[in-house]
Curated annotation (Swiss-Prot):
It comes from Gallus gallus. InterPro entries: MESD. This is LRP chaperone MESD. GO terms for cellular component: endoplasmic reticulum. It is found in: Endoplasmic reticulum. Residues 180-220 have a biased composition (Basic and acidic residues).
Length: 220
């Protein structure tokens, strides 16, 4: 609202200046000092510079500032859970633009991906989440958030959907409900291997103890 009002005021000021310039007598205009550029010949770059100069002494609402000029949101360390690293990321990404990649399962066409992700976006919109969506492949889309603090809540919603294969957020891949067996088992592979290795070491140690006890009996 504030930005729109400033543009309207700027346009009105330029129009008044142009009208005043047109009404000046020809002789007076020639007698005056030569201007670098007629205001009626301003292009978009000139308008942008003029607006920037105008805004130097103007109070701009924080929400109208570009993201790189906004002051960082204060972090409430009392809300950080040491056992949940995601809680730290939520606070550090609050108020910042964030993107996540979403993969649709079932080898869909680009049109199907468009329809499915559109339904997800609509559900998020109804839940008051401001999300933009861009299709980047036959089965992939980007969900962009203006406030990254809500990214993990949106991720939880997406991975609970039947056709969501996975969500990639901040370099971390989260398997979705629609992931196939290999995707779902990916995170379980390492714990299972570690358990088997531990059991093998335990069994080996037990055999060595039995051999040592048997040898002691034979020596006696």
């Amino acid at each position: 609202m504030a930005a729109a009002a400033r543009w309207a005021a700027l346009g009105l000021a330029l129009w008044l200046c142009a009208a005043a310039h047109a009404e000046e007598p020809e002789g007076k205009r020639r007698a005056g000092p030569a201007k670098k550029k007629d205001i009626r010949d301003y292009n978009d770059a000139d308008m942008a510079r003029l607006l920037e100069q105008w805004e130097k002494d103007d109070d701009i609402e924080e929400g109208d500032l570009p993201e790189h000029k906004r002051p960082p949101a204060p972090i409430d360390f009392s809300k950080i859970d040491p056992g949940k690293p995601e809680s730290i990321l939520k606070l550090t990404k609050k108020g910042k633009t964030l993107m996540m990649f979403v993969t649709v399962s079932g080898n869909p066409t680009e049109k199907e991906t468009e329809e499915i992700t559109s339904l997800w976006q609509g559900s998020l919109f109804n839940a008051n989440y401001d999300v933009q969506r861009f299709i980047v492949g036959s089965n992939r889309a980007i969900f962009m958030l203006r406030d990254g603090g809500y990214a993990w809540e949106i991720k939880d919603f997406l991975i609970s959907q039947e056709r969501c294969a996975d969500v990639t957020l901040e370099g971390q891949v989260y398997p979705g409900k629609g992931a196939d067996g290999s995707e779902k088992g990916r995170n379980k592979t390492k714990p299972e291997k570690a358990k088997k290795k531990k059991d093998a070491e335990k069994s080996k140690s037990s055999h060595e103890d039995n051999r040592a006890q048997t040898k002691q009996r034979e020596d006696l």
